[in-house]
A protein has these predicted regions:
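Residue-level detector of alpha-helix initiation sites
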Residues: 32, 181-183
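Conserved active-site-proximal phosphate/metal-binding subdomains
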Residues: 156-175, 183-358
Length: 358
């Protein structure tokens, strides 16, 4: 664990809630947030979150066991609420003494109550105040408020506006973790000044030596300027921030009809790789349609996301895959270990707080 002693202001109620040394969360990035990265984050004093959306149930069991075999520190698992085996996944988490259930979508009331009764801290991700207020009414313990600067699926509200708005909306009983655009100790202090109880970072953790993303892909991230990302709906029908590559430029110029064959192939591939049933995919598509303003063509396109992300992040095939990223990639220039990163962030935060107190 990082041996940097945090300023008292950094010992937030979130630290007490989940039992971590520092109020820093490593987000559950699909194909990225596996046992190695989560373990490194836990060892460094932060909260690491496994990404289960791209795992089968057996793979999730293996990944949880791999983390637990190397650390007794708290960590979490990110879940999709629309998978057929959600209860089985939660049961595995409870049996392994996982601390946090992080949700990519608003969880159902019965999931929230069930997780809390089992001792799990419930923490969904939200992109608007109204979403935060809705889950707060269900009794969640914390929310990750992701602003527009964030990577992957994201909203339209800048982090600097979303964070205080969500804080005001959920009241004092729900911790707020600010996400989107953070990478430094000064950013951590800024988030706390906005009323947050900590920060969550994805791209910054992706760009560490503990991330399993191929080195050549990391190099492409490091070469991306602040203006080198785009929020596109051409990947899977929903707004998603990705690195602007030649493929993305081509997708941006194409119609949904031109992308339909790719989407159908992706759906078949994702079904084969995750063991998802055809019924579960159809059910998920219907849920997406009813819970959003997406058209049916956009729903069909949704299968693109995991397959194209895997092609880019795992296989390094940016000619056929995409690289989800936050805008913060444009200001990241090196690949530290997670322990080095955490020590640097807390050291910078300490120095920033000392400077502001003069």
């Amino acid at each position: 664990m990082s041996d940097v002693t945090p300023h008292p202001a950094l010992r937030t109620r979130f630290c007490e809630l989940v039992g971590v040394k520092y109020p820093v969360v490593q987000t559950g990035m699909g194909w990225v947030a596996g046992a190695r990265l989560v373990t490194a984050t836990a060892h460094a004093g932060g909260l690491g979150i496994l990404a289960s959306a791209t795992m089968t149930l057996d793979e999730l069991k293996e990944q949880i066991a791999a983390v637990r075999s190397k650390t007794d520190a708290p960590f979490g698992v990110n879940l999709r609420t629309d998978v057929a085996d959600i209860e089985a996944r939660i049961a595995v988490m409870v049996d392994a003494n996982v601390k946090v259930a992080s949700f990519a979508q608003a969880p159902r009331a019965d999931l929230v109550s069930g997780c809390k009764e089992a001792g799990l801290v419930v923490m969904p991700t939200v992109g608007a105040r109204r979403h935060a207020e809705k889950v707060a009414e269900l009794g969640v313990d914390a929310v990750i408020a992701q602003g527009a600067e964030g990577g992957g699926h994201t909203g339209q509200i800048p982090t600097s506006l979303l964070t205080p708005d969500v804080v005001a909306g959920v009241g004092k009983d729900v911790c707020v973790i600010s996400a989107g655009g953070w990478s430094s100790g000064a950013g951590l202090v800024a988030a706390l000044a906005l009323g947050a109880d900590g920060i969550a970072m994805g791209t910054r953790f992706l760009l560490t030596t503990d991330s399993r993303v191929p080195d050549e892909v990391k190099a492409q991230y490091l070469a991306t300027p602040v203006t080198g990302t785009v929020v596109s709906t051409r990947v899977d029908g929903a707004p998603q921030r990705v690195v602007r590559t030649d493929l993305v430029n081509k997708l941006e110029k194409s119609s949904w009809l031109a992308n339909l064959p790719r989407s159908l192939r992706s759906a078949h591939q994702f079904r084969s790789e995750t063991g998802a049933s055809l019924w579960s995919l159809l059910k998920e598509g219907r849920a997406m349609k009813e819970g959003s303003e997406l058209s049916w063509p956009q729903v069909v396109m949704a299968a693109n996301a995991p397959v194209m992300t895997k092609a880019g992040l795992v296989d390094g095939r940016t000619d056929v895959g995409v690289l989800p990223t936050g805008q913060v990639a444009g200001v990241i220039t090196e690949l530290p270990s997670v322990e080095e990163l955490m020590g640097r962030i807390i050291g910078e935060a300490n120095a920033t707080l000392d400077r502001l107190s003069l």
